Amino acid sequence: MTPKLIVALDFDNQDNALQLVEKLDPNHCALKVGSELFTLLGPQFVKELVRREFKVFLDLKFHDIPNTVAKACYSAAELGVWMINVHAIGGLKMLQAARESLKTYGKDRPLLIAVTVLTSFEEGELASVGIRNTLPEQATHLAMLAREAGLDGVVSSAHEVKIIKQKCGENFITVTPGIRLPNNLKDDQSRVMTPQQAIREGSDFLVIGRPITQASNPYEVVSALLRDL
């Protein structure tokens, strides 16, 4: 069974990242590698996590012309990762190209999910980039586009999970960042929820980074989260 908890490796060096990884169990959590760590350490670091039998979510949010995104997704799959993502705003053709690029992997292909609206966005910011929809409307619209393209699910704030499930089906995966513990500040995330709230909303996977990586004892935080989930 795939764990619901995805620990975001929000570190700027390999030593600190691996110190945390060594305390984690691949049966209890997956790991997320984002742009900072991937740019710093590259594919070999991802392969090392896979070698340690962790499910790896490669969070690089590909967004480019369809052919480029297709090749990037194929290259990511070559690393043996469990999940990759693209920006839904890239459009239907880009999403379809990403999906098609993974067909050769058959049942062993990674999950392909689309980013809807970043959880750092606030309501007024959509208008500043020319989008007139509300946040829930835009997230739902992009989720339905991803569903049409044949993707497995989306990255979305927990605030939009219920409506996305209603529109796209219960089996459409929702991966939820912006998860904060009750005693944590929101920092640069605007639309946040606690783990328990997000699970009640229907989130399938919870991405948790700084509440774990910046904790005085991150291992205790992980253990407490696993008990709660």
From Swiss-Prot:
Its EC number is 4.1.1.23. InterPro entries: Aldolase_TIM, OMPdecase, OMPdecase_AS, OMPdecase_bac, OMPdeCOase_dom, RibuloseP-bd_barrel. Pathway: Pyrimidine metabolism; UMP biosynthesis via de novo pathway; UMP from orotate: step 2/2. The keyword Plastid does not apply. The active site is at K61. CDD domains: OMP_decarboxylase_like. It catalyses: orotidine 5'-phosphate + H(+) = UMP + CO2. GO terms for biological process: 'de novo' pyrimidine nucleobase biosynthetic process; 'de novo' UMP biosynthetic process. One of its GO terms (molecular function) is orotidine-5'-phosphate decarboxylase activity. Transmembrane segments: none annotated. The keyword Lyase applies. Homodimer. Catalyzes the decarboxylation of orotidine 5'-monophosphate (OMP) to uridine 5'-monophosphate (UMP). This is Orotidine 5'-phosphate decarboxylase. It comes from Legionella pneumophila (strain Lens). The gene is pyrF.
